[in-house]
From Swiss-Prot:
Subunit structure, as described in the record: Monomer. Associates with 30S ribosomal subunit, binds 16S rRNA.
Family the entry assigns: Belongs to the TRAFAC class YlqF/YawG GTPase family. RsgA subfamily.
Lineage: Bacteria, Bacillati, Cyanobacteriota, Cyanophyceae, Synechococcales
Protein name according to UniProt: Small ribosomal subunit biogenesis GTPase RsgA
Coiled-coil regions listed: none
Amino acid sequence: MLEINKDRIKGIVLALKANYYIVQIDTINLIPELFKKKIGDHNFRLLCTKRSRLSYKGHSVSVGDFVLIEAIDWTAETGVISFVEPRKNLITRPPVANVTDVIIVVSLLDPSFDLNQVSRFLMKAEETGLKVTIVLTKRDLIDEKILEKYDKKLQTWGYQPIPISIVNGEGIQKLSARLKSMKLGVLCGPSGVGKSSLINYLLPKISIPIGKLSKKLKRGRHTTRHVELFSIYSDSFIADTPGFNKPEFYTEPSQVPQLFPELRSQLLIKKCKFRNCMHLNEPDCAISRDWERYSNYKNFLQEMLNYHH
């Protein structure tokens, strides 16, 4: 992550608080020696403002942005953002830049597993075009047969779910390996499914920064009021997001088939007679109707047709 350019240091925006930006930099070899002995951590954070010219030019700063920092005061742990690098992408709810993965977190019980709700969250994740992982929390609350039922169902949808329990640690090793392979993964899901509990479980294993900034932030048990990145491993980050129970959609009807992996896989090997086939009642449609979420597909397609009418 480290980069120097005319006395500017590269970092990643972890959080926005009021008019300030918390930026993590990896500068163990750059921080003045006397100060380095006090902090003892290479993942160092600065509380930053941004140059007014960025606003004049219409350059917003979002969590996940890579930025250049100047006017650094190592003692006060402050700096000024002078440049925002071009983004690879930006998801909008909530705004997070340079996302590589979407992690849908749903509970197996309390709140109960809702297949229709899970399907809609997965569809929303597929809209991003990014890699999608589904995590099933509270594994310890259900028996093996029920888990197998949900696992097989999600596999037919095109996913490999990761069931976990923060009570007994089941599945955490597999999830950790998956998180380690990500650059920036966003946790999404309904309220109350255990996203924040999962973050709190992982936090002891994460390199938590020390110094004045951490004391100013008074971080204790994590609860989600805004989006924030957490550094895991070396160059991997996860973003927790406020929970919401009903994803909003504005999908173009022609793009709806791309939200269903089980339909996409058919389209890779089959071709319909008409290029604009919506896989409903068109003649010579090559797509099978014999898949579980076909009714979900039809209903959602009609929903989007009505929306765009």
